[in-house]
């Protein structure tokens, strides 16, 4: 069910780590998406996932520079986000394999009233009220 992402300029988007990683690795379609966004937000969890993927100190430095160049806003994990994520894990871990990181990212998106941009729609399909656009690397 993946499709190219289409959004109206001005949409509040929060990006999943997959889109950031593709842009960082030079995928033009992902980079163009970031360039066309009015603002780029990510969950603190997405930030940590991105940093964990660094292969060495030089790449860690390059990731930080990449985030700075795109003026990425990192959204903190608040008590409200924690509570909502706990409910998602409790409700969907067994039935839909809801993972901790995905629950926190979904809760961050909902709490901040932002649309989640991801290529991993199946990770989030069970989350009610989550606005999501799917992205496919071309």
Locations of regions flagged by a protein language model:
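Short loop/helix-cap segments at secondary-structure boundaries that form the rim of catalytic
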Residues: 31-35, 122-129
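Short beta-strand->loop
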Residues: 78, 131-138
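Nucleotide phosphate-binding site architecture
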Residues: 20-21, 48-51, 125, 133
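Alpha-helix capping/helix-boundary segments
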Residues: 19-20, 46, 81, 104-105, ...
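Active-site neighborhoods of divalent-metal-dependent phosphate/nucleic-acid chemistry enzymes
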Residues: 2-7, 11, 73-119
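A general structural signal for well-ordered alpha-helical segments in protein cores
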Residues: 43, 47, 60-63, 82, ...
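Short, well-structured N-terminal submotif of metal-dependent ribonuclease cores
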Residues: 1-42, 52-65, 138
């Amino acid at each position: 069910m993946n499709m190219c992402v289409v959004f109206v300029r001005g949409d509040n988007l929060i990006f999943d780590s997959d889109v950031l990683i593709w842009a960082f690795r030079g995928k033009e379609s992902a980079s163009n998406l970031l360039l066309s966004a009015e603002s780029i937000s990510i969950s603190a969890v997405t930030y940590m996932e991105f940093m964990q993927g660094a292969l060495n100190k030089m790449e860690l430095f390059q990731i930080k520079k990449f985030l700075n160049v795109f003026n990425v806003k990192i959204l903190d994990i608040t008590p409200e986000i924690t509570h909502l994520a706990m409910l998602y894990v409790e409700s969907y871990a067994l039935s839909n394999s809801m993972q901790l990181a995905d629950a926190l990212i979904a809760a961050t998106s909902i709490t901040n009233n932002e649309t989640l941009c991801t290529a991993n729609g199946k990770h989030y399909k069970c989350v009610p009220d989550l606005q999501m656009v799917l992205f496919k690397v071309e």
